């Protein structure tokens, strides 16, 4: 029986009163309260605290505020697509303490891996007798997303059952351990990384890979994609936006005070992860959970940590903005006005500041070794004295300062910030130093994304490499604390949006698909990144697999057609006639009448132009498209609703098309093996992370003569030398001996070929050769 525990509720109320009435500064007070906000299992009771300033603002009497507990009459199956479940409802009176509402309750079931817990939300009654709800943004489990009641969950029991205890014990120190950077990183979007598209399926992949690595078995190309990395960085795994026009995943029919029936839909949105609503940031997006249980993120962390050579987990967190949908689930105090992504967060509000830092702490406690902060340049606040926005670097430092507790080990994770300030200022590409956070924080191992890693890099345009030479010099001199590499979720997406009329490097391939694939999985670029550049290299698995990628978000109703119009050009870069013709490709669009690629291309040629000239008037766009002669293929009649259906079909079909598992058959065994060897080469030489020293050399061959040829000579602390030569773009070099180039320190004997790109035969051990675009070599020499 669910009932209020009077003694525990009084103690909780007294603690809140004492804490709020203390003499500490406001933010320090909120930091003390934040770890207890939400619903927690305490001695078989549920302790529940909600931050509810809106109830004070609307002068809601304390007697009209309740915790609404929803106990399912039958156990929901979280693996079912849809079901109707009847819930028994219990109203428990809550206490008001300033702008908090709290209560302690007996009888609520705590969810576990094997049991569904009691669902809950705050309910309050207005003067007219109508009921309103406040959801828990600090929830531990959200099986139906951030816009539905939360599930009461035994999170301490979940964390206590982790299977990577030895990993954490080995890293325990007397005081707080500070984790450092990995040697290299693989970036993964969970929904497109495996056929299953869940954390559970990704965990299974790593567990199978671990078994083969431990046994010394030969790896398949699809397995080598994931091998040789020191760390895995997941694109954000927080709950994202929902369908703007519905349906909701939790739709209820009220039967009175005691029960309600809920039409439950398993969350099935597609999103690249960055469209967050802040609510639920401490837990996991249910779309990514095969079982619907947050334990899957814990299992994944354990699979990485238990790998034969343990891998680190890096979580990508988004606290720099909220999608506008966030205003539907959080009170107005959380926000500081609109921005280009949706809403600015109210970082200067002590409670908001404390709660967001607490969300971060909870998420990292799943067992992350590192944290990547998205869009750090967006953490700003309005300074009325100067009437300007200021960067909240104190908040960024607070993020780095959080001490985590995992399996008895106290530690501070490694941090990397994506910060391109003064972006989006017009001259940001010239003005950004990519060092603002590095130079402003206390820790010497804080990282940022480097200049070739930030979004707007397109290495398949002719002249790219020499046009970036000044940035390359910065990488060589200052790049030890930068993430390096040209292939990530942002750069690959930008590549798919490049105007096809620009001067592209046609030597990369015979078709646009080949050019794009080889631009972001390029042997020469990989050689430069892994065998020459300082910093920490990062690869995006969709690029390494030569799979597709784009802006994936199927929740929009109002602007969905506009988003697809902006993405339409990617059809020319990522989909050819053969790929489109495959039975598993674009089934929704084919069913709507776009039976072949040409019919879709023709439609997408008109759509972006009409979006622009009509100022996105969907009624006019539909009318004009209907009047095209000869008629366009697609649904008839072509209404606004049909346009939105096409946009939704595009997003869902592209999401499936981007799945890495669908591209396994096209993998080149020689290329995946070369990349794997190169990663292991870097892991065996962690000193390459350091900036170039006085004896090191990096340059391009002069005169250029139509060929950009990069050379690098690095010196290890133990005396080993690493020499690299890479053909970045242009014509054939003509025959030459790389070891006879006029580079100081290259003289003498003892050089051995360590790595060669696939086009160079394995029988090549030295001497003259001719290099073509994307070819290269690595030599090593040990001191005699």
What are these regions (language model features)?
Residues 1-186, 199-214, 230, 516-527, ...:
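Carbohydrate-interacting/catalytic domains
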Residues 244-295, 302, 323-351, 358-359, ...:
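Aromatic- and acidic-residue-enriched carbohydrate-binding clefts of CAZyme catalytic domains
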Residues 407-591, 599:
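Conserved alpha/beta catalytic core and glycan-binding cleft of carbohydrate-active enzymes
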Residues 189-203, 275-294, 338-354, 376-393, ...:
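The substrate-binding groove and active-site-proximal loops of carbohydrate-active enzymes
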Residues 133-136, 197-200, 243-247, 324-328, ...:
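Short, solvent-exposed loop/turn and secondary-structure capping segments
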Residues 184-188, 232-234, 313-317, 371-373, ...:
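Hydrophobic faces of well-ordered beta-strands that scaffold small-molecule active sites
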């Amino acid at each position: 029986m669910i009932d209020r525990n009077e003694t525990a509720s009084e103690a909780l109320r007294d603690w809140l009163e004492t804490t709020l009435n203390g003499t500490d500064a406001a933010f320090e007070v909120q930091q003390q309260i934040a770890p207890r906000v939400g619903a927690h299992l305490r001695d078989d009771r549920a302790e529940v605290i909600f931050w509810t300033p809106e109830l004070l603002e609307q002068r809601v009497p304390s007697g009209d505020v309740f915790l609404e507990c929803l106990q399912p009459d039958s156990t929901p199956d979280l693996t079912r697509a849809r079901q109707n479940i009847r819930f028994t409802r219990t109203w428990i009176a809550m206490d008001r303490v300033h702008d908090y509402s709290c209560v302690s309750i007996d009888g609520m079931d705590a969810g576990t891996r094997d049991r569904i817990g009691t669902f809950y939300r705050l309910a309050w009654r207005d003067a007219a007798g109508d009921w309103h709800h406040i959801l828990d943004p600090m929830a531990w489990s959200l099986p139906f997303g951030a816009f539905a009641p939360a599930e009461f969950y035994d999170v301490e029991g979940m964390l206590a059952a982790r299977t990577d205890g030895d990993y954490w014990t080995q890293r325990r120190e007397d005081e707080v351990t500070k984790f450092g950077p990995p040697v290299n990183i693989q970036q993964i979007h969970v929904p497109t990384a495996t056929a299953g598209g869940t954390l559970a399926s990704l965990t299974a992949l790593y567990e199978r890979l671990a078994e083969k690595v431990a046994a010394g078995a030969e790896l398949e190309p699809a397995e080598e994609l994931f091998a040789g990395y020191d760390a895995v960085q997941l694109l954000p795994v927080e709950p994202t936006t929902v369908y703007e026009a519905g349906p909701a995943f939790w739709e209820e029919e009220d039967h009175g005070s005691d029960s309600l029936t809920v039409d439950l839909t398993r969350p099935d949105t597609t999103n690249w992860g960055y469209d967050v609503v802040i609510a639920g940031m401490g837990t996991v997006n249910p779309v990514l959970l095969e079982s619907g249980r947050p334990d899957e993120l814990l299992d994944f962390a354990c699979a990485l940590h238990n790998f034969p050579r343990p891998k680190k987990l890096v979580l990508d967190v988004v606290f720099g903005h909220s999608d506008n949908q966030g205003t539907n689930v959080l009170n107005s105090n959380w926000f500081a006005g609109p921005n280009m992504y949706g809403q600015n967060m109210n970082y200067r509000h002590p409670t908001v500041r404390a709660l967001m830092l607490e969300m971060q702490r909870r998420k990292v406690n799943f067992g992350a070794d590192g944290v990547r902060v998205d869009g750090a340049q967006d953490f700003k606040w309005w300074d009325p004295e100067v009437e300007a926005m200021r960067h909240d670097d104190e908040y960024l430092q607070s993020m780095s300062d959080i001490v985590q507790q995992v399996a008895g080990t106290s530690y501070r994770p490694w941090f990397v910030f994506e910060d391109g300030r003064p972006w989006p200022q017009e001259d940001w590409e010239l003005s950004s130093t990519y060092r603002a956070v590095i130079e402003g924080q206390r820790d010497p191992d804080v990282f940022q994304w480097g200049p070739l890693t930030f979004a707007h890099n397109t290495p398949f345009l002719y002249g790219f490499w020499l046009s970036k030479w000044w940035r390359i010099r910065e990488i060589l001199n200052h790049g030890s604390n930068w993430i390096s590499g040209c292939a990530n979720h942002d750069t690959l997406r930008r590549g798919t949006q490049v105007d096809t009329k620009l001067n592209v490097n046609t030597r990369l391939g015979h078709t646009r698909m080949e050019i794009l694939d080889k631009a972001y999985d390029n042997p020469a670029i990989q050689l430069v990144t892994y065998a020459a550049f300082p910093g920490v290299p990062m690869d995006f698995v969709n690029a390494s697999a030569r799979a597709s990628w784009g802006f994936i978000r199927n929740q929009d109703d109002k602007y969905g057609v506009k988003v697809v119009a902006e993405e339409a050009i990617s059809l020319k870069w990522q989909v050819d006639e053969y790929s489109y013709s495959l039975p598993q490709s674009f089934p929704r669009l084919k069913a709507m009448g776009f039976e072949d690629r040409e019919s879709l291309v023709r439609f997408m040629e008109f759509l972006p132009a009409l979006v622009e000239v009509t100022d996105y008037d969907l009624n006019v766009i539909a009318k004009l498209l209907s009047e095209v002669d000869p008629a366009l293929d697609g649904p008839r009649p072509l209404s606004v609703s049909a346009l939105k259906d096409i946009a939704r079909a595009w997003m869902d079909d592209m999401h499936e098309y981007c799945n890495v598992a669908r591209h396994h058959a096209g993998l080149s065994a020689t290329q995946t093996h070369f990349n794997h060897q190169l990663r292991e080469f870097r892991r065996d030489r962690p000193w390459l992370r350091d900036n170039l020293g006085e004896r090191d050399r990096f340059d391009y061959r002069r005169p250029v003569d139509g060929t950009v040829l990069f050379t690098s000579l690095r010196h290890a602390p133990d005396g080993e030398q690493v020499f690299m030569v890479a053909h970045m773009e242009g014509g054939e070099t003509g025959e030459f001996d790389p070891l006879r180039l006029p580079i100081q320190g290259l003289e003498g004997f003892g050089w051995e070929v360590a790595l060669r790109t696939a086009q160079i035969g394995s029988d090549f051990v030295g001497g003259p050769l001719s290099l073509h675009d994307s070819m290269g070599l690595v030599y090593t020499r040990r001191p005699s």
